[in-house]
Amino acid sequence: MRGFMSKDGNLDTSEFDTLANKEYTAEQKQTLEQGQKEFLSQTTTPELEADDGFIVTSASFAQSTPSMSALSGNISPDSQTSDPITKAVRETIIQPQKDNLIEQILKDLAALTDRDLAEQKRKEIEEEKEKDKTLSTFFGNPANREFIDKALDNPELKKKLESIEIAGYKNVHNTFSAASGYPGGFKPVQWENHVSASDLRATVVKNDAGDELCTLNETTVKTKPFTLAKQDGTQVQISSYREIDFPIKLDKADGSMHLSMVALKADGTKPSKDKAVYFTAHYEEGPNGKPQLKEISSPKPLKFAGTGDDAIAYIEHGGEIYTLAVTRGKYKEMMKEVELNQGQSVDLSQAEDIIIGQGQSKEQPLITPQQTTSSSVEPPQYKQQVPPITPTNQPLQPETSQMQQSQQVTPNLLNTATALSGSMQDLLNYVNAGLTKEIDSNKQIDLIKEAATAILNNEKSDIAEKQANIIALAENTVNNKNLKPDAKVAGVNAILETIKNDQNTPNLEKSKMLEATVAIVLNSENLESKQKQQMLEKAVDVGLSLKDDASRAATIDGIKDVVIKSNLSTEDKGTMLIAVGDKVNVSELSNAEKQKLLGSVLKKDVEAQVLSPAQQQLMQQHLDKITAEQTKKDTIKKVNDILFDPLSNTELKTTNIQAITSNVLDGPATAEVKGEIIQEITNTVAGSSLEAQDKAAIIKGVGETIATHSDTSLSLPNKALIMASAEKGIAESQTNLPDRELMTKGLVDGIYEGKGGPEITKAVSSGIDNSNINDSEKEALKKAKDAASEAALDRDTQNLTEGLKGQNIEEHKPHDDIYNKAREVINAVNPVIEALEKSKEPVVSAEDRIVQETSSILNNISKLAVEKVNNLRAMLSPNGNLKTLEEKKEESIKKVDELVKAFGTKSSTEEQQSFIKTNLIDDKTLSKEVRLQTIDKLLQEQKRAEAIENPSVKTEDVRVVSGKSKLKPISKDNPDIEKAKMVVGRDRVNIKGNIKIMGALMNARDIIQSENLNKSIPIKRESSPPQR
């Protein structure tokens, strides 16, 4: 569990530096093995309190110490390792832990439903084990992380790993301690109290040369009592802990230093040596000889008692809570320094508070097992959920059995117990007599509670008998005519509460009692639906309070089946099941467990067809919400894994976070939920410890991913909504304003890189407006956004200028009507001519048939020619409305002017783009020539704007054609874009606003020019008629 996990969360194949060039003797090896056996077999042997720390003095060796970076790879084979401590830890701790873990993984694979995957992984393990018994490749493969995590969640395996670890390190420390005669072995740290304050202590750490490396200060904090929740739901009170000011930078003297501080118990005292765990900081000698913080070692998982920087760290180990001597703020500061020094964080449970001072000796120093590189501590503010903290002024009351509580408040309990000594029927008779005699409903409920307590505490009954008696008591309560309806509800709920508080009944048996009680209630004819629902909800509450997830799942499944099989109407069944779902939804369970329970309820309910469509939709909404929350949590965990991976550069981090963003956008969640997740992503990136430029690069990638995402799966309004959320995450981050400005620019750059439209860019401003920051910060971020937009538009202007070079905008001259009609006749006759040409193929039939076919073809030509000539004659008549070329040109110029004038009435870019599409591209009633002339004129005239008298005033609506400065037609070789920019230089915003319009016009021109026209085919004439 700890002792072999790497920083990226994978099993590490490296362990620690060699200690000395010394082999185990047979006697030493036998001593170690015997010590471990004795430790694992002992029960309650008294242990001494763990010392606060040790000092290890380096010994002199001729060989230099291997660097930590060299040890981050695979462990050398046993034959290449002569260090006795390395061998001891490998053989007694690391390898046994790995063996146990693999054994559990194989068990989990055997139960896996995907048999192909299970067999693949099983073979992978077996094949690798033949090559390398440490399975370093398997443990180092990220694809195997889910199997490792699942195995580590097994309670029995956790116990085994903790036992192996504690026993192994205890034996190593005992064997290699100074007290055991080992040269340079472990010695206690000497803390000295401050004269002025009893809660302050200090110690000076020196290297071998006697030079001071640093002074450590320890502060004992006595705080207002607060409680921490353990994994099993129980709470522990904390009122005292300590903080140690671990140094970040060391520049006094040369050498190395290793600080390992013992974790304190919940009451602020030190644990016994056999239960001690540690927080360790490793300072390795840097290039300049000064110590650098390279590693952090701590038990896993590391949690913090709050969200502030002063929140103290704590862990749960062996079912107990221990506080560590580091705060959240100090931990973040240390982790940043570790990353800066390219070190790695590791997870170890040490056996003593240890300070290892190493001097500037050219000979090999002595290094302890505390230098092992094992499981990593992920940044806890992201990796681990902080459990609820409940401040209290009162000490926690000791847990007592229900029997003891009842004896204090209920003097008649002895009577019910006496009644039960005869038979269950005697007890029921006693209870019923009391319910008849007693009018006060509170006393009636107390009597029912007494009976339930007597049943569960009856030592003469086994579990089956207790269960049967509880069911009989519940049925008696429901059917008792002397109880009012509300008293029946309170009486059954009292029975359920008694079941909950009983310390002797196993959880699964409690689950059966709850299920049976619900069955009695739902099938009773003496209760209304409202009262049944109240009792059902109480039973669900009790079931969800059980200590293990298997019992909770069994209870909910059981109650669900009871509802479906009950004699309730279909409508009432649906109501009851919705009540079960609501209780699960509002419980304190994790989202993952809620998701599992609700999914199970919904599936069974749909199969049984007891939920109405509206009820199904309601439960599905609850499930979707929980799924979205779990997805958000999982997504941010992945983002943090990427951000804190010291082995990946900014480009790789950007690519990986872009992939996560794309997965979110493709997911089934609503746009609002997707926006919330994207906001968390950008907020997490912005708040990370990366450099500002790196964060801006990652944010740019997120913006580009959103802008380029498929419009079919994500509509434009939804893209804008999500982009606004992305900017809100940046704006509301806790990083400084200049960094946020840089990241806002990065987001805008990403939008332009992804060819996002104006709606997407405007969404950035919307995100700023909706963020919870002050007005001055909003203004600064908007300026940053505008600056990025302006820079992007400048690039577009330059690209447009380059794109226009070499293009020739020619005037398209319309043909007159006569030419067009003649061309139409030619095009119609051509197919007939082609058919006639085919008749010239080699003659294969009789002469008469050839004459007949030729006559038919000529007849078709004659009819078609007559039809076209008549049409031409009608057109040439006085009523034919025939227009000359000059008239046609004048009409075209007029139509072009009308279109240009209509275009000028459109004030916004969106309206102008719509006009181009509707009137120039889609309107085929206008001739191709008119539309192309309109586009050419708009391209020439659109870019001219009259200079504004006041140069400081810039608006996007200034579109007055200048009469003083005219732009020459764009030539083929040198388009005069630069001149246009000079003419309206004081209103550059106008040009930039029209860049998109110019692009739209050129795009429309290309579309019109590519429209398919019937190509004319010249009539082929033969020199002589066909041969007969």
Swiss-Prot record:
Coiled coil regions, renumbered to chain: none
Entries under InterPro entries matching the protein: Rickettsia_antigen_120kDa
Family annotation (Pfam families): 120_Rick_ant
Keyword field: Cytoplasm
Disordered: region residues: 359-405
GO CC, alphabetical: cytoplasm
Keyword Cytoplasm: yes
Biased composition (Polar residues): 359-384, 391-400
Subcellular localization: Cytoplasm
Keyword Cytoplasm in record: yes
Designated name of the protein: Antigenic heat-stable 120 kDa protein
Organism: Rickettsia africae
Gene behind this protein: sca4
